[in-house]
């Protein structure tokens, strides 16, 4: 909740779809992409865009982009502009670089020596300033302030060894990876192909799904030989709604070609100096939808384990466990189960307060959280509450909630946070406030419970988060046993994590790549 309210926002969502078999297809590609983007709406609410193609030798790209939520941008009339297509890619955006305006909406389309390409990007380039200067020195004009346009221009650059009649897209993508080590997941459309690309550090997620016949979608045991198409997405959460079955993640550094005939890996680019993988650990904590799959495990399950670990690290005498709706609910359930306390709802959220809410006047601003939450006071009068939240960023939203609960009859309110304190900005695709704005870096942090008005405040440790994320991951290459990554009394859980690969830069200040800022 704190993340959403106070500035830590999801990055972007990318999606692609290609029909299999004979073309023109009967598959409604624009609607599949739209539903896929609706499933990724939590990753970006500022703008949305779709580019489709018929996949012919001289393909016609159809483009529609707009500001706002997916369902507002893609009305039935707007979707008609994208018909007669066999493949396409889409994007939902939240600005991490570049202003929030239509010119920065993705996907970007650019003409190359071998025809048009369309590119959708999730992430943020760690060396964007240097790359911008390099492109401008080469005489390549940039029309937006988005680093995603720079990626598109780098892909349009013709490698010296490429022949005029034989485009080498693998070489172009490898050149991009050489110029920009992180952080990005990309979907690239050219003629009758879609390329799915993940940076060598695997910082941002990307996965592939198979569109099934409707009769086979819900039968997981049935191994159908029929395939209606392929999809690629930042998360797997929308696959069920479009009739797709999760296949696998795109590996760090992998270049995957998706065509009407199937999928194949073209290359896997290694990390320099044997660096570890650096998948963003906050995808598990907050950004991803709980029904998404990362590293062969469901996000919901990881959050539940975080709650259990938090109960081990920070037990407290109380009568019930609850949560600030609603991303912290799995952690709250895990905490309640581990410490044997009932899980009880104490707040209900007004789901329609958000970006479409009428701008409040002074009186409504003074009411603060009262317009966002209702209080279920009959559930907690005279009782001690353990309130679980996913994070506390600045602290000026959780404090009014604590006050509201106490004024409504709570005897005590103990705050337990299912992630460690955020101390550092992210420069790899997440919009985090400046270091000075973060509550963990302020003098008030030393007496946080008093500052917030709570009876106690405890965060999950970094080691506890890492253990919760990694305890079920199957490290096939390393042949790791579970007990090797458990938290030990000497604190070597974090030491082992550094060998296995999750980015905790916002928690520890240890960035996986050198930053050029």
From Swiss-Prot:
Amino-acid positions noted as binding Mg(2+) in the UniProt annotation, renumbered to this chain: 327, 389-390
Catalytic activity: 5-phospho-beta-D-ribosylamine + L-glutamate + diphosphate = 5-phospho-alpha-D-ribose 1-diphosphate + L-glutamine + H2O
Record keyword Metal-binding present: yes
GO-annotated molecular function: 4 iron, 4 sulfur cluster binding; amidophosphoribosyltransferase activity; metal ion binding
PTM sites of type N-acetylmethionine: 1
UniProt-listed Enzyme Commission number(s): 2.4.2.14
InterPro entries named among the record's database cross-references: GATase_2_dom, Ntn_hydrolases_N, PRibTrfase_dom, PRTase-like, PurF, PurF_N
Propeptide: 1-11
Binding site for [4Fe-4S] cluster: 280, 426, 503, 506
Residue ranges constituting the Glutamine amidotransferase type-2 domain according to the UniProt record: 12-261
Cofactor(s) needed for function: Mg(2+); [4Fe-4S] cluster
Keyword set, alphabetical order: 4Fe-4S, Acetylation, Allosteric enzyme, Glutamine amidotransferase, Glycosyltransferase, Iron, Iron-sulfur, Magnesium, Metal-binding, Purine biosynthesis, Transferase
Top-rank taxon, per record: Eukaryota
Metabolic or biological pathway, per its Swiss-Prot or TrEMBL entry: Purine metabolism; IMP biosynthesis via de novo pathway; N(1)-(5-phospho-D-ribosyl)glycinamide from 5-phospho-alpha-D-ribose 1-diphosphate: step 1/2
Active-site residue numbers: 12
Similarity comment: family membership: In the C-terminal section; belongs to the purine/pyrimidine phosphoribosyltransferase family.
PANTHER family associated with the record: AMIDOPHOSPHORIBOSYLTRANSFERASE
Described purpose of this protein according to its UniProt entry: Catalyzes the formation of phosphoribosylamine from phosphoribosylpyrophosphate (PRPP) and glutamine.
Subunit structure: Homotetramer.
Descriptive protein name: Amidophosphoribosyltransferase
């Amino acid at each position: 909740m704190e993340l959403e309210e106070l500035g830590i926002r999801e990055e972007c969502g990318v999606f692609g779809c290609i029909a299999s078999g004979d073309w023109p297809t009967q598959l409604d590609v624009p609607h599949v992409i739209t539903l896929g983007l609706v499933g990724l709406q939590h990753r970006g609410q500022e703008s949305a865009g779709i580019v489709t193609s018929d996949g012919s030798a001289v393909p016609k790209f159809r483009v529609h982009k707009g500001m706002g939520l997916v369902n507002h941008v893609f009305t039935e009339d707007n979707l008609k502009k994208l018909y007669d297509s066999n493949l396409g890619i889409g994007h939902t955006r939240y600005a991490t670089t570049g202003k929030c305006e239509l010119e920065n909406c993705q996907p970007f389309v650019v003409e190359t020596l071998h025809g048009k390409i369309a590119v959708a990007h999730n992430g943020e380039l760690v060396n964007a300033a240097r790359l911008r200067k390099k492109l401008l020195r080469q005489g390549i004009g940039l029309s937006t302030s988005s680093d995603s346009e720079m990626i598109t221009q780098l892909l349009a650059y013709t490698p010296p060894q490429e022949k005029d009649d034989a485009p080498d897209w693998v070489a172009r993508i490898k050149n991009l990876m050489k110029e920009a080590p992180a952080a990005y997941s990309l979907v690239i459309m050219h003629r009758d192909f879609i390329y799915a690309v993940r940076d060598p550090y695997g910082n941002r997620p990307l996965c592939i799904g198979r569109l099934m016949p409707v009769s086979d979608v819900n039968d997981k045991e049935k191994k159908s030989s029929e395939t209606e198409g392929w999809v690629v997405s930042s998360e797997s959460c929308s696959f069920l709604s479009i009739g797709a079955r999760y296949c696998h993640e795109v590996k760090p550094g992998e270049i995957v070609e998706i065509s009407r005939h199937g999928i194949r890996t073209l290359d896997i680019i290694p990390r320099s100096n044997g660096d570890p993988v650096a998948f963003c650990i906050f995808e598990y904590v907050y950004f991803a939808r709980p029904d998404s799959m990362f590293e062969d495990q469901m996000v919901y399950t990881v959050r539940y384990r975080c709650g259990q670990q938090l109960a081990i690290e920070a037990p407290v005498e109380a009568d019930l466990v609850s949560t600030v709706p609603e991303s912290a609910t799995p952690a709250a359930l895990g905490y309640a189960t581990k410490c044997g306390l009932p899980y009880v709802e104490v707040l209900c959220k007004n789901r329609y307060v958000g970006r479409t809410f009428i701008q409040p006047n002074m009186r409504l601003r003074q009411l603060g959280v009262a317009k966002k939450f209702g209080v279920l006071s009959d559930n907690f009068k005279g009782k001690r509450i353990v309130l679980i939240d996913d994070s506390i960023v600045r602290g000026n939203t959780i404090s009014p909630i604590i006050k509201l609960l106490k004024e409504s009859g709570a005897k005590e309110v103990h705050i337990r946070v299912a992630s460690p304190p955020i101390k550092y900005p992210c420069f790899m695709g997440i919009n985090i406030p400046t270091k000075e704005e973060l509550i963990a870096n302020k003098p008030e942090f030393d007496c946080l419970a008093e500052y917030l008005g709570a009876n106690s405040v405890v965060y999950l440790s970094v080691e506890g988060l890492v253990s919760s994320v990694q305890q079920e991951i199957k490290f096939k290459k390393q042949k790791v046993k579970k007990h090797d990554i458990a938290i030990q009394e000497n604190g070597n859980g974090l030491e082992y994590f550094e060998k296995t690969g999750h980015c905790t830069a916002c928690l520890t200040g240890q960035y996986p790549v050198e930053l050029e800022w």
